[in-house]
Amino acid sequence: MQLFHLCLIISCSCPTVQASKLCLGWLWGMDIDPYKEFGASVELLSFLPSDFFPSIRDLLDTASALYREALESPEHCSPHHTALRQAILCWGELMNLATWVGSNLEDPASRELVVSYVNVNMGLKIRQLLWFHISCLTFGRETVLEYLVSFGVWIRTPPAYRPPNAPILSTLPETTVVRRRGRSPRRRTPSPRRRRSQSPRRRRSQSRESQC
């Protein structure tokens, strides 16, 4: 993201949509996926519709309410905290860019194109990044990855063969606990069956002794 801004500044003195697209194409040629090191991918996140992600303001408020102390700390807390810091700083720079364009670009049509591109395209990428790392810190990385896979399977399944409602991230930990609890009774079932099968034999032997 920071490289994107640097390239944009070098490309021309007046940032345009064409310059940003050229820059992004160069970055894509490097095959950089910000989710790879966390076990996910851009493709996996793309299964979630754009309106699934909260607004950037809501995500920033959530990050501040839950993790502000850790984000402002000079200590390294986790890779997710580091990624959150970078995403928040990057969005701040994008807002500065949009403000600069609004003040310095004379052509209204070009100005609208740049601001719209930043808000829609780059805004969605930042929303995805913020949501992913906040969710990993809140629910755990494995739970989030399980959710992404579950949602991807659900959305690609024809409506006639899938549940009416999509998976919900906050319910996955509860489902996991239920599964763990469900295994234990199966292990205990053999012993009561043996006791039940042995009890009639004892009764028969006792009745025979009494008859004798």
UniProtKB/Swiss-Prot annotation:
Any one cellular-component term (Gene Ontology): host cell cytoplasm
Subcellular location field: Secreted; Host nucleus
Keyword Disulfide bond among UniProt keywords: yes
Database matches in InterPro entries: Hepatitis_B_virus_capsid_N, Hepatitis_core, Viral_capsid_core_dom_sf_HBV
Keyword Secreted set for record: yes
A Gene Ontology molecular function term of the record: RNA binding
Maturation and modification: Phosphorylated. Cleaved by host furin.
Lineage: superkingdom: Viruses
Cleaved propeptide residues: 184-212
Biased composition (Basic residues): 178-205
Sequence repeat coordinates: 184-190, 191-198, 199-206
Segments forming a coiled coil: none
Residue numbers marked as site, Cleavage: R183, S184
Family, similarity comment: Belongs to the orthohepadnavirus precore antigen family.
Protein name (Swiss-Prot/TrEMBL): External core antigen
Native organism: Hepatitis B virus genotype B2 (isolate Indonesia/pIDW420/1988) (HBV-B)
Upper lineage: Viruses, Riboviria, Pararnavirae, Artverviricota, Revtraviricetes
